[in-house]
Amino acid sequence: MGVAAVFTAVQSDLGALVSEASNSRSADIDLMTTAQILACMNAEDRKIADAVAAELPAIAQTVDRIVAAIGRGGRLIYIGAGTSGRLGVLDASECPPTFSVPPGMVVGLIAGGDTALRTSVEAAEDDEATGAEDVKAIGLTTKDVVIGIAVSGRTPFVMGAIDYARRIGAFTAALTCNPGSPMADLADIAISPVVGPEVVTGSTRLKSGTAQKMILNMLSTASMIRLGKTWGNRMVDVTISNRKLADRATAMLRDATGCSADDARTLLDQSNGSVKLAILMQITGCDADAARANLEAENGFLRKAIERAEKTPPQS
């Protein structure tokens, strides 16, 4: 579908969307007790994981494209409005401390800019030209992947960004909660979990927002695992930026290698706070320079670097 036709489709009846329908199970929610309200919400929330599971093939395809993009020097770009935009910014902001990636590798853009993170800027989502301008302003290239996030699947700001990304040749995905949406037609791939009507009609920050958060978790986490940012399930690329993370790094190093707390702290000091380097040094007996060389030779994959170091005799 061409972009003009897609934008025309956005004018269709909002009430026809799954996410805007009335939920019969919560029709009398204003008459319920507190316990009944919570039970109703909890029962609806139980449906979210199954809805996400149905989209795993599309999520997997998107992860593979993200991994390939970052591997060739590209970026993962999230863009959305309102709650959807905030969730994208949240996921992007967690990647540098969790996986030690550069801040610009995973980018979150929200309609209305940073002000919209704390204060709603509702009208900002209606301008498709601004969506295109925002991704253009960050120097979007064909190497990048753009994930447009909008529950309705028809937010003009997000559609403008997706349209621009496609026109320059960047890979695009639409994360919506309405299958067959205009955004789904516009993007290269659609991820559309059907969570059903909300307990408060149209309040898509509820089930829909939770589904989006789960999927964003998958997109970033699975991509980083594929890029060698973990060793097993250990978060070995964590950035030590506070006392809690320093304690976590020490505990991780002790658990991974069996060394003492004092040895762990010494290794982390010698490795300049790199858990990966410290583990490699302790397991293989390499010094920091040799460990770093082995990691670089294996593109940061610790498991492969350990195997490489163990096959390489230490230099006298």
Curated annotation (Swiss-Prot):
The active site is at E94, E125. It is an enzyme of class 4 (lyase). Residues 66-229 form the SIS domain. It holds the Pfam family GKRP-like_C. It comes from the Bacteria. The keyword Translocase does not apply. Pathway: Amino-sugar metabolism; 1,6-anhydro-N-acetylmuramate degradation; Amino-sugar metabolism; N-acetylmuramate degradation; Cell wall biogenesis; peptidoglycan recycling. InterPro entries: Etherase_MurQ (IPR005488), Glucokinase_regulatory_CS (IPR005486), MURQ/GCKR (IPR040190), SIS_dom (IPR001347), SIS_dom_sf (IPR046348). Its EC number is 4.2.1.126. One of its GO terms (biological process) is N-acetylmuramic acid catabolic process. The keyword Repressor does not apply. CDD domains: SIS_Etherase. A lyase-type mechanism (elimination/hydration) is suggested for the cleavage of the lactyl ether bond of MurNAc 6-phosphate, with the formation of an alpha,beta-unsaturated aldehyde intermediate with (E)-stereochemistry, followed by the syn addition of water to give product. Homodimer. Belongs to the GCKR-like family. MurNAc-6-P etherase subfamily. Specifically catalyzes the cleavage of the D-lactyl ether substituent of MurNAc 6-phosphate, producing GlcNAc 6-phosphate and D-lactate. Together with AnmK, is also required for the utilization of anhydro-N-acetylmuramic acid (anhMurNAc) either imported from the medium or derived from its own cell wall murein, and thus plays a role in cell wall recycling. This is N-acetylmuramic acid 6-phosphate etherase. It comes from Jannaschia sp. (strain CCS1).
